[in-house]
Regions:
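Active-site mouth of glycoside hydrolases
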Residues: 1-243
């Protein structure tokens, strides 16, 4: 406060413990989430106390709070996931699609924001010191996910995104023929012969850590055709709005 700071962002409090960089923003002695119990659904008593105490002391000094929810949450098998294995941490766009991951995020948000801080007597949702609650950090349904492509256990989540993209295309165009017509420009068609939304085989758009890029004047039938890109972005924005 003496340096003029009036807002603090409480970032990545959900990060797991372990070796760097996996635990890049979590206290190894008392993390907020007690992953030692085999899931990420319970608070570590000391970790929650540290969180509450820090928030209260910031408030005492006139510093407002920016609360992050999901940042580096480690989704593990003990959370009761839809698919076998651990989904892992920092998986970005997938928690915006999968219903079970969304349920887990809601559960965490309710527990964190609605419990009463013993040092202030207020829950975060009622505390005027909280000026922002950020639901997701660097997350978007249109974000690239190439960093997870090498992981076989993430395939069910990638398949889920593709299925929902194909369902979106069917709602928009109804038939493969109409989709093909919409994706054709000056005799070039972006829809491959082996792609059919009825069969769920139309590929979406992927990229690296950032939103995939598209050059509007690139080859129309390229791997990221402007037509495919436009529909995938519309689809992703729809997911973002419903999240």
């Amino acid at each position: 406060a003496s340096m003029g700071v009036n807002v603090i962002r409480l970032h990545a409090a959900d990060a797991p413990i372990g070796e760097e960089p996996r635990s890049w923003s979590s206290c190894k002695e008392a993390p907020l989430l007690d992953y030692e119990k085999g899931n990420g659904r319970e608070f570590h008593p000391e970790g929650l106390d540290r969180f509450d105490y820090f928030a209260a002391k910031l408030k005492e000094r006139g510093i407002y709070l920016h609360i992050d929810l999901i940042v580096a949450r480690d989704f593990v098998e003990g959370d009761g996931l839809d698919y076998p294995g651990n989904a892992g941490t920092c998986i970005k766009r997938f928690p915006m699609y999968n219903k079970r991951l969304i349920e887990l995020q809601k559960e965490y948000a309710k527990k964190l924001l609605c419990h009463v801080n013993p040092y202030t007597g207020l829950a975060l949702i009622d505390d005027p010191a909280v000026i922002t609650v950020q639901i997701n950090n660097e997350e978007s349904a249109i974000k690239g996910t190439m960093e997870t492509d090498y992981r076989e256990d993430m395939q069910p989540y990638r398949d889920e995104v593709q299925k929902r993209f194909n369902d979106f295309l069917l709602m928009k165009y109804a038939t493969r023929e109409r989709l093909k017509e919409a994706w054709t420009f000056e005799g070039e068609c972006a829809l491959a012969d082996n792609e059919d939304p009825v069969k769920g085989t139309v590929r979406g758009v992927d990229g690296n850590f950032y939103q995939p890029e598209c050059e509007p004047k690139r080859d129309w039938n390229g791997e990221v055709s402007p037509a495919r890109y436009a529909d995938f972005m519309e689809f992703g924005i729809t997911i973002n709005r419903s999240f």
